[in-house]
């Protein structure tokens, strides 16, 4: 009613009682916000900032550690590759040494077999020559006896004649 009684009031200017109540309500709202809400918001904001910055620092630390581990693994891999190449080269050298040993043993065995074969051939040749001398001598004496018509029974004479004849053949064959 009070408002209706005052009919000549300017609508642009507020009523002073509303202005006082609004100011008190606003001041009370600002006080509650500053006293209770803002500290909690600041605490939550700071916790969020710390979490983000801490997460970034942890991520950077994890990245640095991962890079360090990667470098260690690469160094170990290079070391393992070098060791594998050395082992491979050692194995090749050992294999070549074994190969050379086997070849040397095979050559020695081959030379031994050839020498034994030559010795056996010389022995057989000597035996055959001796047998042939005896046989040829006997045949020659028998044939000469038939041609001459008398027996050449004298063993010493016969052996001397045969040996001279065969030596003459050998020296003629050697020329």
UniProtKB/Swiss-Prot annotation:
Signal peptide: none annotated. SUPFAM superfamilies: F1F0 ATP synthase subunit B, membrane domain. It is a single-pass membrane protein. Pfam families: ATP-synt_B. Keywords: ATP synthesis, Cell membrane, CF(0), Hydrogen ion transport, Ion transport, Membrane, Transmembrane, Transmembrane helix, Transport. The chain crosses the membrane at residues 19-39. GO terms for molecular function: proton-transporting ATP synthase activity, rotational mechanism; proton-transporting ATPase activity, rotational mechanism. It is found in: Cell membrane. One of its GO terms (cellular component) is proton-transporting ATP synthase complex. The keyword Transmembrane applies. Its main location: membrane. F-type ATPases have 2 components, F(1) - the catalytic core - and F(0) - the membrane proton channel. F(1) has five subunits: alpha(3), beta(3), gamma(1), delta(1), epsilon(1). F(0) has three main subunits: a(1), b(2) and c(10-14). The alpha and beta chains form an alternating ring which encloses part of the gamma chain. F(1) is attached to F(0) by a central stalk formed by the gamma and epsilon chains, while a peripheral stalk is formed by the delta and b chains. F(1)F(0) ATP synthase produces ATP from ADP in the presence of a proton or sodium gradient. F-type ATPases consist of two structural domains, F(1) containing the extramembraneous catalytic core and F(0) containing the membrane proton channel, linked together by a central stalk and a peripheral stalk. During catalysis, ATP synthesis in the catalytic domain of F(1) is coupled via a rotary mechanism of the central stalk subunits to proton translocation. PANTHER family: ATP SYNTHASE SUBUNIT B, ATP SYNTHASE SUBUNIT B', CHLOROPLASTIC. NCBIfam families: ATP_synt_b (TIGR01144), PRK05759.1-3 (NF004412). Belongs to the ATPase B chain family. This is ATP synthase subunit b. It comes from Salinispora tropica (strain ATCC BAA-916 / DSM 44818 / JCM 13857 / NBRC 105044 / CNB-440). The lineage of its organism: Bacteria, Bacillati, Actinomycetota, Actinomycetes, Micromonosporales. The gene is atpF.
């Amino acid at each position: 009613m009070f408002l209706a009684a005052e009919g000549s009031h300017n609508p642009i200017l507020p009523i002073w009682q509303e202005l006082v109540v609004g100011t008190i309500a606003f001041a009370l709202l600002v006080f509650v916000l500053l006293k209770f809400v803002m500290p909690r918001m600041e605490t939550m904001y700071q916790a969020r900032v710390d979490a983000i910055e801490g997460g970034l620092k942890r991520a950077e630390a994890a990245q640095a550690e991962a890079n360090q581990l990667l470098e260690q693994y690469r160094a170990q891999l290079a070391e393992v590759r070098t060791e594998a190449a050395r082992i491979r080269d050692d194995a090749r050298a050992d294999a070549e040494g074994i190969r050379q040993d086997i070849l040397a043993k095979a050559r020695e065995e081959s030379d031994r077999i050839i020498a034994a074969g030559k010795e056996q051939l010389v022995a057989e040749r000597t035996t055959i020559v001796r047998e042939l001398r005896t046989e040829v001598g006997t045949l020659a004496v028998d044939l000469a006896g038939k041609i001459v018509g008398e027996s050449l029974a004298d063993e010493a004479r016969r052996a001397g004649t045969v040996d001279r004849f065969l030596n003459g053949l050998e020296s003629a064959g050697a020329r």
